[in-house]
Amino acid sequence: MRDDTSYLESQLITYIGNKRSLLEFIGQGVSVVQNKLNKDKLTCLDVFSGSGIVSRYLKQYSSVIAVNDLEKYSCIINECYLSNPTKKELEELKELYEKLTAKIDRKMKSIESSRAKGTYKNPGFISELYSPADAENIQKSERCFYTPYNADYLDVARQLIETEIPEKYKACFIAPLLSEASIHANTAGIFKGFYKNSKTGIGQFGGNGKNALTRITGNIQLNFPVFYKNDCKSYVFNQNANELVTSEELYKVVKNNGGVFDLAYFDPPYNQHPYGSNYFMLNLLASYQRPDTDLISKVSGIKKNWNRS
């Protein structure tokens, strides 16, 4: 990265097929296109953006970048990390961040106090449906994706983002929260299931081997988003890829380049396993709409109407 390596190394989601280790190789392809077209800055298209890491990488080489994904969480991630806040907007974001995190901390202290007093009431559906009530006494009927503290934090933070943050800035706070929710989950990387005790079938943090407990039980903390400031214009689409590539709307963003993209990156799902169910939790946090408990799977709590592509 030319200026800030933290932009490519932090606030990422844990993701199947993440291409972070291949960025240098992808960069070789970028150089080929630059040399062939005799252009330093390219118009770029990422049709299956996923975690957004390739789009972040391409941003430094782009005058225009258009990205797409069928999943809402991916779109929010790209809206945040491909943006170019002005100096004034950065100041506003920092002020909002300080106020927001202070409110989250106050609310979490209140919740922790209520736990100690035995008057705890879950603050939202993540703690209600996807976390045990007591980490030391997990019941067979309870899902175990997050520690009680982290589930409470996700609910509190997401609710306050919804009520306290202006619409145009929400993605800049939801995206870092999605990263934390991805990292500090009691899973091996996808949300199809959570670690359990194989003998009892009861949820257990880290499973029998107590794997990755530092990661799983570490407290979630909302971070200020990382940005890479340049003159690249970004456009985020939330469409079926087959429909997007034939739509006039897509090519309007590169009308100043003859309606064509210099470089198109296609990285479709590598197998039949659907991302809509593998990462359903991130979509729940993205929309923050409580699922109908009659319409979610019994074991993992996956919404039955997840996106199918």
Tell where the protein language model's regions lie, with residue ranges.
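S-adenosyl-L-methionine
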Residues: 1-48, 53-60, 75-77, 84
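SAM-dependent nucleic-acid methyltransferase catalytic core
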Residues: 3, 23, 28, 53, ...
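Intrinsically disordered, low-complexity coil segments
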Residues: 34-41, 111-118, 245-261
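Glycine-rich, phosphate-binding/catalytic loops in enzymes
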Residues: 61, 83-84, 253-257, 276, ...
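Short beta-strand element of Class I
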Residues: 63-68
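Conserved SAM/SAH-binding beta-strand->alpha-helix loop
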Residues: 71
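Conserved phosphoryl-transfer catalytic core
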Residues: 80-143
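Conserved Class I SAM-dependent methyltransferase catalytic core
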Residues: 307-309
